[in-house]
Each structure stands twice: as structure tokens, then as C-alpha cells.
Amino acid sequence: MTWGYRLIPEAVKDLKKLDGSQRKQVIKALDKLITNPLPKAEGGYGSPLGSKNGVDLTGFLKIKLRGAGLRIVYKLVRIEGVAYVLIIGARAESEVYEDAMRRIEAFEYWYESLD
């Protein structure tokens, strides 16, 4: 199957805020991700997220860019063959996940339309 990715508008803003080298690393990571965006348990690159400290991201996946100190959180919609990128952010504690949760709540229509 051929996979693609799509950034929600807020994730596009996240990408634009990064410096040039970080932006290149993120784009490279996204290009690698679409070669196999499945969870690691299925041989892919994504690590499943769950519920922790009141933040429920069950059904979402993440990839870490260790060198850049960034995380990318995405929702894989298999039937469409698309990884929807919700947030690109720093790995500071659980901050990126809390921001991701706020984005889900703020864009409930978008989130519901993924399923």
C-alpha cells in the first residue's frame, strides 16, 4: 500500500516555527514514516500512545527525532492510507502530548471525521 501524510493547519504552523535544520529533519522523518507508518508491533515506525496523566491519546502514534529533541504525533487512517500529523513539538516532559490533546478537543470535528 502507498502511504501519505497530511499536516493539520496547526502542525503546519509548528513546522514553520522550527529552524531550518530541524525542519529538514522533520521532513526527512515524515518521508521515512510514510514508507511504513504502522505501529512498531506491525513492523512500522510508530510507537502507540495511550492514556497517561489525564492525557488520552489512545489511537495515536508517535515518532521521536532524538537528535532534534522533537516528537511527531499522528493518527493513522488505514482505509485512506494517510498519516494525519497532529503536532510537531519539543519533547519537554508531557507538554507535547498535552498540546496534542488540546488540539483534539479544539478540532473535534476534524478528529471525528478521521474515523
Which residues fall in each region the model found?
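A short beta-strand-loop micro-motif that forms or neighbors metal/cofactor-
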Residues: 33-35, 80
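Arg/Lys-rich, positively charged N-terminal/basic patches that mediate binding to nucleic acids
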Residues: 1-32, 109-115
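Enriched for short, Lys/Arg-rich terminal
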Residues: 13, 65-115
